[in-house]
């Protein structure tokens, strides 16, 4: 069951706002776990969870890799059959480079770009990529970044 923006824009907006709040709460939990376990806590199951929370009730197939072609503007993402292998390679690169690249934003920026380039999910790729980027920045800094939740204020 899902609501489409075209069918009920106000309900869609409310569901999307709640999803973003839930995704942030899940992300804070993921950061806490990663701070205890290190970079090994960054894996595809975490990404699946972050994606599922971002698109719950607004898209089918949340939290799993796409099994169909998609088109994103002028970018044609890799074939869906290549996505699982590309994601395994992506995770491996993050793990391998973690100790080799100490700069606080290079790997998070790479993660943001690479996830959006692979476009592993049907919906919510940008939200999932931004969450992954944030998690890696927090892990590199050794703390959940200070501040307040601003998601609802920004999307209203």
Language-model segments: residues:
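FIC/Doc superfamily catalytic core
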Residues: 1-156
């Amino acid at each position: 069951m899902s609501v489409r923006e075209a069918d009920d824009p106000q309900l869609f907006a409310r569901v999307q706002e709640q999803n973003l709040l839930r995704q942030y709460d899940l992300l804070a939990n993921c950061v806490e776990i990663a701070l205890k376990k290190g970079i090994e806590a960054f894996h595809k199951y975490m990404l699946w969870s972050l994606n599922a929370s971002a698109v719950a009730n607004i898209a089918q197939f949340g939290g799993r890799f796409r099994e169909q072609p998609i088109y994103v503007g002028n970018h044609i993402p890799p074939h869906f059959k290549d996505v699982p292998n590309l994601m395994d390679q992506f995770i491996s690169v993050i793990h391998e480079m973690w100790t080799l690249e100490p700069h606080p934003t290079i790997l998070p920026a790479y993660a943001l770009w690479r996830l959006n380039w692979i476009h592993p999910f049907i919906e919510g790729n940008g939200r999932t990529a931004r969450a992954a980027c944030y998690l890696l920045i927090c892990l590199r800094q050794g703390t959940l970044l200070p501040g307040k939740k601003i998601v609802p204020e920004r999307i209203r």
